[in-house]
Amino acid sequence: DDTWEVIQRAIAERQHASPMELVALQQPGKGKADAVRVGFARATGDVLIILDADISVPPEELPLFVRALDDDRCEFANGSRLVYPMEAKAMRFLNILGNKFFGYLFSYLLGQPIRDTLCGTKVLRRSDYDRIVANRDFFGDFDPFGDFDLLFGASRLGLKIRDVPVHYKERTYGETNISRFSHG
């Protein structure tokens, strides 16, 4: 697998055109939650963004998330793939049912409407993330993807969570590492 080399070349080719420093990190652990934690620890900005690398959510939609924070509509912007119609092969039927179930369950448990707990696109302020991390021991380290950890943590802190609808597309890069049955 030459993924790391491809990433290094892509950064070298694009760094001069980017207004931001482009950084690639190799995580010491496994899973998305570990990758997000490593990335957030290295990030220098006041706003932290999670966007899955398969680009099934267009990065052009990220300003909607940041605007939701800036306009004080929320303190935690959570992507929802279950609002707009999605491409035919973007999500399997059982995954749609599971995502809807978790949305109803979390809405009930957290007392805030949440349609899609497992959308990979999430945005929050660093100060709020740092508070979630400081309270992480309360729920434990049970979530290999980090979505539930962030949502439970945000709710426990009383943060206003708001869904931001996204246009979910079929994955065009790579293959999923998530098993519908062993990962839920």
Predicted regions and their residues:
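Catalytic donor-sugar/metal-binding loop of nucleotide-sugar-dependent glycosyltransferases
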Residues: 139-140, 151-169
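Acceptor/aglycone-binding surface of glycosyltransferases and processive sugar-polymer synthases
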Residues: 20-22, 27-42, 47, 59-140, ...
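Cofactor-binding loops of NAD(P)H-dependent oxidoreductases
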Residues: 25-28, 51-53, 164
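Acidic donor-binding segment of Leloir-type glycosyltransferases
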Residues: 1-25
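Acidic donor-binding/catalytic loop of UDP-sugar-dependent glycosyltransferases
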Residues: 2-6, 51-68
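Structural element of the ATP-grasp superfamily
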Residues: 7, 105, 129, 150-154
